[in-house]
A protein has these predicted regions:
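Cytosolic covalent-transfer regions centered on His/Cys nucleophiles
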Residues: 1-167
Length: 167
């Protein structure tokens, strides 16, 4: 578990991403299976209060428009009153999964972000930060080639340091 953070105090992605929510080798082969696998890694009782409600919120958001943003990346996200605090899960799929991305290509990197229903600012800031970091091809390559969750956490720490002066 990790300490609770105030909604506006996220300073790095690791503030919202518990090591237990990092998956190297996602197993699902459909969009829904990937989302479910990621939601299952969120900490019930700490980050979320109801796994099924959170899963439903993310799947409903996905129906509106795919969060497969292209270039091998998907950022499924949602808001729910079953989310206690802004939280995330990150998964890598070595073979790639069709996520109905804008470019039609499979996604390999999946960053799930969920936040309380009544909070927008931190959710949008976190989405922007994730998106900015994943535009760095070197960083994305490190994630895809990671052998362990520790490799992913190290890559995030390194990337965060290189952007520490940018908010």
């Amino acid at each position: 578990t990790r300490p609770a953070i105030a909604p506006d105090s996220m300073t790095t992605l690791l503030d919202i991403l518990a090591p237990s929510a990092v998956i190297v080798g996602l197993e699902g082969d459909t969009k829904d299976a990937i989302i479910e696998e990621l939601v299952d890694r969120l900490e019930v009782g700490t980050a979320i209060s109801d796994r099924d409600k959170v899963l439903q919120a993310v799947l409903e958001r996905e129906k509106i428009m795919s969060t497969g943003i292209g270039d091998g990346i998907a950022i499924p996200h949602g808001k729910s009153d079953a989310v206690i605090e802004l939280t995330a899960a990150l998964g890598i799929h070595k073979r790639g999964v069709d996520f109905e991305a804008l470019d039609g290509e499979p996604a390999f990197v999946f960053f799930l972000l969920v936040s309380p229903a009544n909070v927008s600012g931190p959710h949008i800031k976190a989405l922007a930060r994730i998106s900015r970091m994943l535009k760095n091809d070197g960083f994305k390559k490190k994630l895809i080639e990671a052998e362990s969750s520790a490799d992913i956490i190290s890559a995030i720490e390194e990337e965060e340091k290189s952007h520490s002066s940018v908010g």
